[in-house]
Amino acid sequence: MSRILESENETESDESSIISTNNGTAMERSRNNQELRSSPHTVQNRLELFSRRLSQLGLASDISVDQQVEDSSSGTYEQEETIKTNAQTSKQKSHKDEKNIQKIQIKFQPIGSIGQLKPSVCKISMSQSFAMVILFLKRRLKMDHVYCYINNSFAPSPQQNIGELWMQFKTNDELIVSYCASVAFG
């Protein structure tokens, strides 16, 4: 008796040819097609059908063997995953601490008739949002509204991370922030 297990992704008309045997294949095909088409729970019936086919092929494994394999391997796998997770977490924390400590230079350039900051270069933590720069300028210039631009080209979102802006748009290891009292561009 030859039995062949083919792909389960066949069309519905081809599902009857998934298992072929030398004797009784026509009867089995018609019974399988009727089971698939007649029931409202097709997914459940398909699973039962595939389970039956596996048992006919002798590929269904013993449940007790599967449980023993799971019990013996699950403990070591979980321990390994816990160790890996702890190591990754500690690396991320140390990297995050280094990133928080690292400060970048911001060079402020006035646009128009707004006053100039002295000193024009300040340092800020990379983890701060751009809203902190806007707030700093408002306080130092004693103004209600300040419009900021990076490299005289675009106005970043207040939620944008200063470290990301610095990595992408730095000039001579400084982030150039131009500021003005009214909208300068666009």
UniProtKB/Swiss-Prot annotation:
Ranges of compositional bias, category Polar residues: 68-77
Main location: membrane
GO molecular function: enzyme activator activity; protein tag activity
Cross-link (Glycyl lysine isopeptide (Gly-Lys) (interchain with K-149 in ATG5)): 186
Pfam families (alphabetical): APG12
Keywords: Autophagy, Isopeptide bond, Membrane, Phosphoprotein, Protein transport, Transport, Ubl conjugation pathway
Subcellular location: Preautophagosomal structure membrane
Regions that span the bilayer: none
Membrane topology: Peripheral membrane protein
Induction behaviour: Translation is induced by nitrogen starvation. Translational repression during nutrient-rich conditions is dependent on a uORF (upstream open reading frame) present in the 5'-UTR of the mRNA; it promotes ribosome dissociation. Translational induction occurs in conditions reducing translation machinery efficiency, leading to ribosomes scanning over the uORF (leaky-scanning), and increased translation of the mRNA.
GO cellular component: Atg12-Atg5-Atg16 complex; autophagosome membrane; cytosol; phagophore assembly site membrane; transferase complex
Single GO BP term: nucleophagy
Region entry Disordered, spans: 1-43, 68-98
Function: Ubiquitin-like protein involved in cytoplasm to vacuole transport (Cvt), autophagy vesicles formation, mitophagy, and nucleophagy. Conjugation with ATG5 through a ubiquitin-like conjugating system involving also ATG7 as an E1-like activating enzyme and ATG10 as an E2-like conjugating enzyme, is essential for its function. The ATG12-ATG5 conjugate acts as an E3-like enzyme which is required for lipidation of ATG8 and ATG8 association to the vesicle membranes. ATG12-ATG5 rearranges the ATG3 catalytic center and enhances its E2 activity.
Family, per entry: Belongs to the ATG12 family.
Other known facts: Small amount of ATG5-ATG12 conjugate is enough to perform normal autophagy.
Subunit structure: Forms a conjugate with ATG5. Forms a thioester bond with the 'Cys-133' of ATG10. Interacts with the ATG7 C-terminal 40 amino acids domain. The ATG12-ATG5 conjugate forms a complex with several units of ATG16. The ATG12-ATG5 conjugate also associates with ATG3. Interacts with COG2.
Protein name: Ubiquitin-like protein ATG12
Organism expressing this protein natively: Saccharomyces cerevisiae (strain ATCC 204508 / S288c) (Baker's yeast)
